[in-house]
């Protein structure tokens, strides 16, 4: 799953570069959506890791 989070992050960075430099306004919208998806995935994995760490100890 970490692989997919990194893929979303890279795609959002590329779309952001294209969108925010004026190449395509639609890419900026895609970059925002993918960025927030990547942040949500990161937060979910962070919470799961913290819960799993406390369950092991």
Curated annotation (Swiss-Prot):
What are the subcellular locations of this protein?
Cell membrane
Per its UniProt record, what InterPro entries does this chain match?
A: DUF1328
Could you tell me the keywords of this UniProt record? Cell membrane, Membrane, Transmembrane, Transmembrane helix
The membrane spanning regions, by residue number, are: 4-24, 33-53
Q: List the disulfide bonds.
A: none
Q: Does the keyword 4Fe-4S apply?
A: no
**In its keyword annotation, does this UniProt entry include Membrane?**
yes
Topology versus the membrane: Multi-pass membrane protein
Q: Name one Pfam family in it.
A: DUF1328
Chief subcellular location equals: membrane
Read off the HAMAP family from this record. Answer: UPF0391
Q: Which family does it belong to?
A: Belongs to the UPF0391 family.
Q: Do you know which NCBIfam families this protein is assigned to?
A: PRK13682.1-1, PRK13682.2-5
This protein's name: UPF0391 membrane protein Atu4467
Q: Which species? A: Agrobacterium fabrum (strain C58 / ATCC 33970) (Agrobacterium tumefaciens (strain C58))
């Amino acid at each position: 799953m970490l692989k997919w989070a990194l893929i979303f992050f890279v795609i959002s960075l590329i779309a952001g570069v294209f969108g925010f430099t004026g190449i395509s306004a639609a890419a900026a919208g895609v970059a925002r959506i993918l960025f927030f998806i990547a942040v949500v995935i990161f937060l979910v994995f962070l919470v799961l890791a913290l819960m799993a760490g406390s369950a092991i100890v």
